[in-house]
């Protein structure tokens, strides 16, 4: 347990995760980053993406989907996010529907007839849907 750290993932609806981990990998605004015990203090914004959790004493990773937020790394790691889901909680058909809706909207709207905020919302919606679909299928990354 000397090389583990407590990870807590909090959403507005629930405490999504609370356990000791050896490694957590998240997508920050500058790319994927891993955090472990004895990591330097950090507070970073998170992008929509997969979260990979290696629990203490395990070689395997638990994979989930998060919808952005921020990570605070001190003597413990805390992630605050609007939504977090495990693969078995994801409604794949709903994700496919959101993906198609966002893709269709982006195909039919241009910068000339939609403002940047609307375009950004559609892109974020598409990214969330794709992330959820990847997580439901076991994650986009290869096993480590």
Task: Describe the residue ranges of each PLM region.
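Compact, glycine-rich, soluble single-domain proteins
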Residues: 6-8, 12-97, 101-103
């Amino acid at each position: 347990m000397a090389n583990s750290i407590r990870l807590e993932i909090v959403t507005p609806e629930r405490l999504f995760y609370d356990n000791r981990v050896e490694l957590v990998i998240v997508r920050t605004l500058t790319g994927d980053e891993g955090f472990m015990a004895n990591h330097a203090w950090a507070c970073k914004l998170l992008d929509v993406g997969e979260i990979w959790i290696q629990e203490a004493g395990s070689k395997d990773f638990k994979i989930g989907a998060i919808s952005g937020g921020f990570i605070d790394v001190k003597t413990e790691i805390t992630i605050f996010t609007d939504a977090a889901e495990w693969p078995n909680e994801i409604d794949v058909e709903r994700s496919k529907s959101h993906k198609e809706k966002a893709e269709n909207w982006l195909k039919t709207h241009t910068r000339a007839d939609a403002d940047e905020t609307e375009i950004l919302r559609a892109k974020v919606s598409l990214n969330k849907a794709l992330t959820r679909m990847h997580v439901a299928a076991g994650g986009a990354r290869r096993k480590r």
